[in-house]
Amino acid sequence: MPNAEARRTTPGPLEVVEIERGFLREVGSVFWFIMNTLQESMERVQQGRAPFRAASFFRESVRAGVDSVPLVGLVCFFLGLTMALLTGYQLQRFGTERLIPGLVAIAFTRELGPLITGIMVAARIGAAFTAELGTMQVNEEVEAVEAMGIGPLRFLAAPRMLALFLLAPCLSTVSNLAAVFASSLVCKVYFSIAFPYFLDLVKDSLLIRDIITGILKSFMFGLLIASIACYRGLTVKGGAAGVGTNTTSSVVTAITAVIGFDTVYNVIYTNFYPT
């Protein structure tokens, strides 16, 4: 009986193929959503007119960027404390606690800062975008926008996508600074590393390409999260239940996309810059 249950629960070749097709279909849908939004916006620009209202862009920028600073800063501050403490005690056993500042700075600037920020933004802002646009879709407000001759992609999706695309690196910078500041406190209190010496160690360890890597990741994470959230919101079906389903799917998909893109980027990066 257990073997029979195992055979029933193990996905067959056809099920695996369907999963792969569904994955590729989702990737293609989001890609074309980005392309169509860009095309619709550029057509408006070529006509000499703004693709969306400036007020909409600034409103979304405040919500996605400024309002997210306390959350991002606080979470990464605690992570910086934890990382400095755990790595510090291990390094102290070998007399290499001076490596703590560089370790934390590189880890957050190149990897943890953009990644943690992307996950938090996907959970907070991505869910809000999907729920908001999904409610508009259910209430037929999107159809009303189309009936007035206004493209919903450039009017509703473009300002959200641009705001998160531009603000994600700023939030990542906040997370990096919060983590490094937290680690400086740990180094001062527990390992007797003065702040000026701490800064010297950070500057000696951190490279320009580490900073550029983190910024590029943040740009892509912001674009992915906003695109997935807006796409899920504008394709809601089934009333209020559909809004909830698509909101959950948006968060899960965005977080998975962020981690997946980060993994692919790191594999490519290490092949070109192995040291």
What is the role of each PLM region?
Residues 9-57, 232-233, 237:
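Short, membrane-interfacial amphipathic segments enriched in basic
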Residues 60-116:
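Active-site cofactor/substrate anionic-group-binding motifs, chiefly glycine-
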Residues 65, 69, 73, 112, ...:
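Selective transmembrane-helix segments that form parts of the transport pathway or gating/packing helices
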Residues 77, 81, 119, 123, ...:
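Hydrophobic positions within alpha-helical transmembrane segments of bacterial inner-membrane proteins
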Residues 85-109, 176-219, 223, 227-249, ...:
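Membrane-interfacial helix-loop-helix connectors in multipass membrane proteins
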Residues 100-139, 143, 228:
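Hydrophobic alpha-helical transmembrane segments of multi-pass membrane transport proteins
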Residues 132-161, 240-243:
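Short cytoplasmic-facing helical segments at TM-TM junctions of multi-pass membrane proteins
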Residues 243, 250-267:
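Final/C-terminal transmembrane alpha-helix of multipass membrane proteins
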